């Protein structure tokens, strides 16, 4: 199991350069040990679906997520997505992005990280990702096609998004953009995501961004 993948601060300024470089170096060392021969070449071909490398701890603040929201860790049937459901997901992504005000966990809960649905005050990136997952499950999309993921953004801060697992690839629903993009077309370094076969577990991913050859 991989522990402590996070190397930045979620929705907060990045850690100091020395601390960040040390943490990233450790994460990359683990990643290189886990990657099979030829994985870098596969990454260069922009694999449609993100693949997991090993079991990982949940992100900071998400440890009790399944107890708070059983639907967040529910298994699904991998039922085929319809064109209408994909259109609904795109529309919902835009609507929630426009309606939820950005508020940090520190301001709401007095702690740096706490994964929860947005309140009347608003929410941060993981809160918004959770709300999108809840709404899309309610609309009939199978839970195992909706996977929470932790990434690094361009500034190397931790950030959370929702993955919509379509048949032709993994697409990202992100509170920072209204465009629903394939994961490989985002600027993000993907660190870990929910295991589609057992969403109460998290898997290391190590793809995109800093891991592109």
Predicted features, each with a name:
Residues 1-17:
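N-terminal secretory signal peptides that target proteins for export/translocation
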Residues 2-4, 39-213:
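A structural boundary/capping signal
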